[in-house]
């Protein structure tokens, strides 16, 4: 709906809008006419929203009133639904007014029958006299309906009705029963009805109207659960049925099913016959509620009423995150989470119980007291279950540890409005003796049994992950099966015993049985694997004892393999395991030995020598696999540390070898088997798939997928989320770059040719073209980039090449989305770089790389390469048989015609802009193989990961040329070294500064003003009026359902409470600010708006050009001035402290997208007088953090234009930029006219209103200054495509841009001169969005034609320029004595500092600000009115009492 609304709002033509409204009205009218029958009433906004949730529309212009309109509407709607179900033949209606047939749209010609019985006195007036009967008569129609009465009748009524009315087949009935009453909850639909509880019953009050209330007993609620009713024919009197068997008694059944349900109103269908009905009946539940466990004794001191789960989670996280959760803090947090309007729904006693419960949770330790399954050796793991069992028994006998208490205490019971249907069986129970409807209380024993149910906390103590259970543990479990079964104590028959049973004994008994069941199940499933591992252990021990040395014929363990970390070792086999016999019998041939065979004495000697070499190789059993990928592997190689390089590492033996799925081409299966890459079934992580699908659906990632319709994204995520699990056969192939991972597969594909159901998914288009060249005899659509594969579909066999470069979660999403996939083949290198997501708001950004997920399904890592020569490969820890020496050189010059590798994507773009199209990043060059590469080294290189560096260094086959672009060492670099990115975008040439400002000579000292005296004022005289109207904290705070109340009103001090304290960490205020200050759009709409307002931008620029006296011809570009401005910007940035530079590291990073913006909430105290003590807190201000290089570039552009602006600026125009109050005072005294009214101007949403027209103005201004075109275009790009985590921003100004102040000021000047006809010589002062003029100019006639096309709206304030009424500018008053701080604002700000106890820290600043007014002494009586004088006096007294600061005014002490 949001996108549809956005499209409609984009229409600006009034004729188009009129047509849309006319068409919408034609569509709306019949719909509203349809709903008018059931809902003709005027509804409250809240009730209308609830009704819309039930699919019932409300006419907003309806004026018909009703005491309980919403409840009556639902009643009417159910009658309408019933009318669509009833047959067009006579129906018997019971307890129904005949006029309500209108709501059913019944044909009045149908001879319907009415049976109404007066049960209550008011029924006499309710039903027409002719429909009232003394008792219910026989129903002679097939269908009947009972209206809102069945729940009051005895359950036997239905039996008697069907028994006495043989023709009746279907009975419809409406019930009014709020299911939440079963839990004694407040109404879940308070806008429709409310509930009150009295003893054993409750009252249903529709619309809070007591006249329409119903009283129910709790037993009535049983009616909502009935599913079937069975009874017998009466025989031999009341108890005659006892003499018959089940077969001898005639049985009758009716089936009850819920037809429709709205709030507390339900429509049931009761049909004669034994039919199917759902086992569980679910009613609408708008919110999720939970009940805390009953952990305190006596039980009365536990929370008994359901509480919103969100509230419970918020409170729980609060008490666990604060250092000390005091009682008052928890009460305050609860108060913060509850709206003031909802306080009457809570009981004070329940809140006390809740706070006590939360205090209990806060005092418990959250660190587990149980041992893990990862630590320790074989013996420790074997005894782990025994220790756990002992620990459990100890806790059962001696009491739970804190951690166990905490887990038990937060095991909240969900309050679910789903009920298991019941069968009421009257066959062998007399109807008159039916007593099954009174709810019974649980006994203590039953309650404790439920408390210690099998599905509780102890599951997490006794259940151990399958992958963490080792051989000895399972074998011990097998041996102890019989003992465990025999040791289980049988239950003692209960008989008639009702005495209290010790719950601890029941608890222990359940744990014992549970442990034995799980041990038996684990052991049975793993018996075969355990026996094999045990045999392997025994055999290895025997061989070690006999040989006394490591057996080189066995596969080395992970600990011996180079490049295997501790985590990897932990995920593979823990002991040595014998290799299959077929590997030991593998034959060996070596074509490289041909020359030696000619010299050797004979063939037998050659075989003996060869076999001797083979026998000494640690990887002799892996030779067939190495030979299959082209390696002889007869040489032992070592890395630079002297460690042996194993060509096969990271072996995983416990993977099952499975058959290839049906339809797998024989050539492909043969090649994979030769490499020992048989498939194994992998369960996919659907959470990763859902994260990827969510990002695609919400267009946070991708390029092609962003162009797809929203329905496709919904279908993608819906299909993924609908899967409970997804398993697929997979062959995972890991190997070093150039090891031949893809070669064997490409060979098989060439053999297969066309016609196969195979798809190859590639991470880049370059890799796709490479595969197309190497496998030319296949269909071109076999090779797809990953986004094309997701959109266009795949075959049943999918090959993912270089899958580490695919987005995390993509493989899981594709396989889950395409259910036809039955085999996947993954080729990649876990040592090389992985996919990096740059979108900050993408969910997959937080997922681990795919190689970490699938590495455990890879049988081995092929640590050998055909690409690099032996010397380079060995330095990288890789096995290689290529002879020769890799040429390595280094200089500061580039080689022509050689691919260039750079560390950052930004540098890649820059180099490609210079014509070097074969430039790649270190990470992006994966898959590239070239004879020569040149690698650029700069300050980003040192922050690249080892995986990325390995990727870059392994690209070349013959030569690597390093290019050092860094400068030589110097003391200057120490500060630049503070972050890894700073040097990459700062120029380090000698700065050529502009001419520095030379201050004017000091004016002669004026004659001092005569001193004066002002009367003592009441300390609270200024702020008292604001405090009188001060509301309660939570009435003023902004409330969000997601984050609770904001926290802007702080402390108990009423002075501090007047000021809104906006903090960056306030989530509620942040989102309120985002909603109020930021608008999202898309790049296309922004650019369209930019083009559509070109003519307005021209008008703005022409007015600005005339106002600022710019020459008519463009100003020639000055490279010298530009460089000087750039160095000024750079010097100002580097003048920051080293700590501040380090804090900006993220924005300095070349990986920070130049169009990305980080948005923060500005932390500040709001001291504006007009916002003191507002009844509702206003949204704050945002700060935007741009890419630092972008800020400095456009900051240079703004400073460059400022330099020329100041050169041409008229003297009557003053811009308060890099000036002092003394400068502004001198200018005002020289140029300001105080004899006429003046105008001060402010704006509504100034930043957000700077739309495409203002951008067009800025572009024209930049072009007039001859700014280079590429810089202007970059500025347009970032303004039309500024991206935050919510999407692309509309064209607007953001605090934090490089040219923010200058651009705001110049837009202000342009708008002011476009709107007003300002006489020549008028004094004007500007600074950002503030401005003031010394006259009140007329509005131009031409502006009325532009007003509606400009979003910017001004708020002019006219002052008379007399005592107490002077123009205000940036907090300064412009007076005939010069500028001075507004005394009221200064005093208000001072009182805040005093109330916070921070006056000593800022006293110097306040004294300086005060001095501009204080210097005028007696003249202040001519400038300030009474209130201003009061504020000025109180400020002076406060500063005197607090003591003088370092910049104190000595004359202040003589003032009073």
Swiss-Prot record:
Extent of Basic and acidic residues compositional bias: 491-500, 529-541
Disordered as annotated region, ranges: 474-500, 512-571
Record keyword Nucleotide-binding present: yes
Residues binding ATP: 735-742
GO molecular function list: ATP binding; ATP hydrolysis activity; mRNA methyltransferase activity; RNA binding; RNA helicase activity; RNA-directed RNA polymerase activity
Comp. bias (Basic residues): 512-528
Domain RdRp catalytic: 1236-1343
ATP-binding keyword on record: yes
Keywords: ATP-binding, Helicase, Hydrolase, Multifunctional enzyme, Nucleotide-binding, Nucleotidyltransferase, RNA-directed RNA polymerase, Transferase, Viral RNA replication
Catalytic activity, as annotated: RNA(n) + a ribonucleoside 5'-triphosphate = RNA(n+1) + diphosphate; ATP + H2O = ADP + phosphate + H(+)
EC number: 2.7.7.48, 3.6.4.13
Pfam families hit by this protein: RdRP_2 (PF00978), Viral_helicase1 (PF01443), Vmethyltransf (PF01660)
Location of the (+)RNA virus helicase ATP-binding domain: 695-862
Residue ranges annotated for the (+)RNA virus helicase C-terminal domain, each copy included: 863-997
UniProt superkingdom: Viruses
Coiled coil stretches, renumbered: none
Family stated for the protein in its record: Belongs to the potexvirus/carlavirus RNA replication protein family.
Purpose of the protein: RNA replication. The central part of this protein possibly functions as an ATP-binding helicase.
This protein's name: RNA replication protein
Organism whose genome encodes this protein: Potato virus X (strain HB) (PVX)
């Amino acid at each position: 709906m949001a996108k549809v609304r956005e499209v409609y709002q984009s229409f600006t033509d009034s004729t188009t809008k009129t047509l849309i409204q006319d068409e919408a009205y034609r569509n709306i009218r019949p719909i509203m006419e349809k709903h008018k029958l059931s809902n003709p009433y005027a509804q409250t906004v809240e009730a209308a929203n609830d009704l819309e949730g039930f699919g019932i529309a409300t006419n907003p212009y309806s004026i018909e009133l009703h005491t309980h309109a919403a409840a009556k509407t639902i009643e009417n709607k159910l009658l309408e639904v019933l009318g669509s179900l009833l047959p067009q033949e006579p129906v018997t209606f019971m307890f129904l007014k005949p006029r309500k047939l209108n709501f059913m749209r019944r044909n009045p010609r149908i001879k319907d029958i009415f049976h109404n019985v007066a049960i209550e006195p008011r029924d006499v007036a309710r039903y027409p006299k002719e429909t009232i009967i003394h008792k219910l008569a026989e129903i002679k129609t097939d269908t009947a309906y009972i209206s809102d009465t069945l729940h009051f009748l005895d359950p036997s009524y239905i039996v008697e009705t069907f028994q006495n009315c043989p023709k009746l087949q279907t009975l419809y009935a409406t019930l009014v029963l709020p299911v939440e009453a079963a839990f004694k909850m407040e109404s879940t639909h308070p806008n429709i009805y409310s509930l009150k509880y009295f003893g054993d019953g409750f009252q249903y009050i529709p619309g809070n109207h007591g006249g329409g209330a119903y009283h129910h007993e709790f037993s009535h609620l049983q009616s909502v659960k009935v599913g079937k009713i069975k009874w017998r024919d009466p025989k031999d009197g009341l108890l005659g049925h006892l003499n018959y068997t089940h077969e001898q008694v005639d049985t009758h059944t009716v089936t009850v099913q819920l037809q429709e349900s709205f709030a507390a109103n339900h429509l049931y269908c009761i049909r004669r016959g034994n039919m199917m009905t759902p086992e569980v009946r679910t009613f609408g539940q708008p919110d999720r509620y939970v009940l805390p466990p009953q952990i305190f004794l006596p039980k009365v001191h536990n929370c008994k009423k359901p509480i919103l789960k969100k509230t419970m989670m918020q409170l729980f996280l609060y008490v666990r995150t604060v250092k000390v959760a005091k009682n008052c803090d928890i009460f305050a947090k609860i108060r913060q989470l509850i709206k003031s309007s909802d306080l009457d729904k809570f009981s004070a006693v329940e809140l006390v119980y809740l706070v006590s419960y939360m205090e209990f949770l806060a005092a418990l330790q959250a660190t587990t007291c149980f041992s893990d399954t990862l630590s320790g050796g074989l013996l420790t793991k074997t005894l782990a279950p025994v220790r756990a069992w002992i620990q459990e028994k100890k806790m059962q006998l001696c009491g739970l540890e804190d951690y166990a208490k905490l887990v038990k205490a937060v095991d909240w019971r969900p309050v679910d409005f789903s009920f298991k249907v019941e069968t009421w069986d009257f066959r062998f129970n007399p109807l008159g003796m039916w007593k099954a409807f009174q709810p019974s209380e649980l006994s203590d024993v039953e309650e404790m049994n439920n408390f210690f149910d099998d599905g509780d906390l102890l599951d997490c103590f006794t259940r151990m992950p399958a992958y963490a259970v080792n051989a000895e543990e399972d074998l011990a479990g097998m041996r102890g099966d019989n003992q465990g079964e025999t040791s289980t104590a049988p239950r003692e028959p209960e008989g008639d015993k009702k005495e209290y049973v010790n719950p601890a004994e029941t608890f222990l008994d359940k744990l014992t049985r549970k442990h034995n069941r799980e041990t038996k199940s684990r052991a049975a499933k793993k018996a075969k694997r355990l026996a094999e591992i045990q045999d392997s252990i025994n055999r290895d021990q025997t061989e070690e004892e006999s040989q006394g040395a490591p057996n080189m014929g066995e596969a080395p363990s992970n600990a011996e393999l180079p490049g295997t970390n501790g985590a990897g070792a932990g995920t593979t086999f823990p002991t040595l395991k014998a290799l299959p016999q077929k590997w030991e019998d593998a034959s060996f041939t070596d074509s490289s030995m041909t020359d030696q065979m000619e010299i050797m004495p004979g063939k037998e000697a050659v075989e003996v020598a060869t076999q001797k070499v083979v026998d000494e190789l640690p990887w002799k059993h892996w030779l067939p696999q190495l030979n299959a990928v082209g390696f002889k592997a007869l040489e032992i190689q070592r890395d630079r540390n002297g460690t042996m390089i194993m060509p096969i590492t990271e072996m995983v033996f416990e993977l099952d070898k499975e058959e290839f799925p049906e339809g797998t081409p024989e050539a492909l299966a043969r090649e994979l088997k030769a490499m020992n890459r048989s498939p194994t079934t992998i369960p996919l992580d659907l959470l990763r798939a859902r994260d990827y699908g969510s990002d695609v659906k919400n267009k946070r990632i991708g390029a092609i997928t962003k162009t797809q319709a929203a329905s496709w994204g919904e279908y993608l995520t819906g299909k993924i989320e609908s899967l409970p699990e997804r398993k697929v056969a997979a062959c995972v192939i890991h190997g070093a770059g150039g090891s031949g991972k893809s070669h064997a597969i490409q060979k098989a594909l060439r053999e297969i040719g066309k016609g196969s159901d195979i798809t190859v998914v590639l991470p880049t288009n370059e890799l796709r073209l490479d595969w197309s060249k190497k496998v030319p005899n296949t269909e071109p659509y076999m090779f797809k980039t990953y986004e094309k594969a997701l959109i266009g579909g795949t075959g049943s066999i999918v090959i993912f090449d270089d899958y580490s470069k695919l987005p995390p979660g993509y493989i899981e999403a594709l396989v889950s989305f395409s259910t036809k996939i039955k085999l996947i083949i993954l080729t990649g290198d876990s040592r090389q770089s992985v996919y990096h997501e740059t979108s900050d708001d993408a969910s997959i950004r937080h997922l681990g790389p795919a190689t970490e997920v699938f590495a455990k399904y890879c049988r081995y890592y092929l640590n050998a390469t055909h690409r690099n020569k032996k010397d380079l490969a060995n330095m990288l820890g890789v096995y290689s048989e290529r002879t020769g020496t890799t040429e390595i050189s280094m200089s500061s010059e580039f080689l022509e015609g050689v691919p260039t590798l750079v560390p950052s994507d930004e540098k890649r773009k820059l180099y490609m802009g210079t014509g070097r199209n074969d430039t790649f990043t270190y990470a992006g060059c994966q898959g590239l193989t070239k004879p020569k590469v040149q690698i650029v080294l700069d300050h980003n290189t040192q922050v690249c990961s080892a995986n990325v560096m390995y990727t870059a260094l392994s690209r070349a086959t013959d030569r690597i040329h390093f290019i050092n672009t860094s400068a030589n060492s110097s003391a200057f670099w120490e500060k630049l070294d503070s972050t890894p990115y700073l040097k990459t975008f700062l120029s380090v040439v000698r700065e050529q500064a502009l001419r520095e400002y030379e201050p004017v000579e000091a004016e002669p000292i004026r004659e001092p003003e005569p001193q004066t005296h002002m009367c003592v004022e009441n300390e609270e005289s200024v702020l008292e009026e604001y405090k009188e109207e001060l509301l309660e904290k939570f009435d003023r705070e902004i409330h969000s359902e997601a984050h609770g109340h904001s926290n802007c009103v702080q402390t108990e001090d009423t002075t501090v409470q007047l000021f809104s304290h906006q903090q960056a960490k306030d989530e509620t205020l942040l989102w309120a600010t985002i909603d109020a200050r930021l608008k999202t759009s898309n790049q296309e709409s922004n650019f369209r708006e930019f083009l559509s307002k070109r003519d307005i931008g021209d008008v703005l620029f022409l007015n600005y050009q005339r106002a600022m006296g710019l020459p008519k011809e463009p100003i020639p570009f000055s490279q010298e001035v530009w460089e000087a401005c750039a160095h000024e910007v750079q010097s100002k940035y580097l003048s920051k402290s080293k700590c501040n530079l380090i804090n900006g590291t993220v924005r300095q990073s070349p990986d920070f997208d130049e169009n990305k913006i980080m948005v923060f909430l500005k932390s500040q105290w709001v001291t504006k007088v007009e916002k003191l003590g507002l009844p509702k807190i206003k949204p704050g201000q945002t700060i935007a953090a741009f890419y630092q290089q972008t800020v400095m570039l456009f900051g240079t552009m703004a400073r460059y234009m400022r330099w020329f602006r100041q050169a041409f600026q008229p003297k009557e125009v003053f811009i308060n930029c890099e000036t002092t109050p003394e400068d502004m005072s001198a200018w005002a005294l020289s140029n300001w006219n105080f004899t006429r009214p003046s105008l001060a101007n402010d704006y509504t949403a100034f930043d957000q209103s700077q739309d495409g027209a203002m951008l067009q103005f800025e572009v024209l201004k930049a072009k007039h200054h001859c700014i280079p075109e590429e810089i202007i275009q970059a500025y347009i790009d970032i303004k039309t495509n500024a991206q935050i985590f919510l999407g692309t921003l509309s064209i607007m100004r953001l605090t934090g841009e490089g040219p923010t102040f200058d651009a705001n000021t110049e837009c202000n000047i342009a708008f002011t001169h476009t709107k007003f006809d300002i006489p020549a010589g008028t004094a004007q002062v500007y600074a950002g969005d503030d401005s003031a003029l010394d006259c009140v100019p007329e509005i131009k006639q031409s502006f009325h034609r532009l007003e509606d096309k400009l979003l910017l709206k001004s708020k002019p304030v006219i002052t008379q320029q007399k005592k107490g009424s002077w123009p205000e500018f940036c907090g300064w008053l412009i007076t005939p004595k010069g500028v001075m701080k507004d005394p009221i604002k200064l005093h208000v700000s001072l009182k805040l500092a005093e109330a916070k106890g921070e006056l000593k820290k800022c006293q110097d600043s306040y004294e300086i600000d005060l001095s501009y007014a204080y210097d005028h002494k007696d003249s202040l009586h001519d400038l300030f009115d009474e209130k201003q004088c009061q504020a000025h006096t109180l400020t002076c007294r406060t500063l005197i009492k607090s003591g003088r600061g370092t910049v104190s005014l000595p004359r202040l002490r003589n003032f009073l």
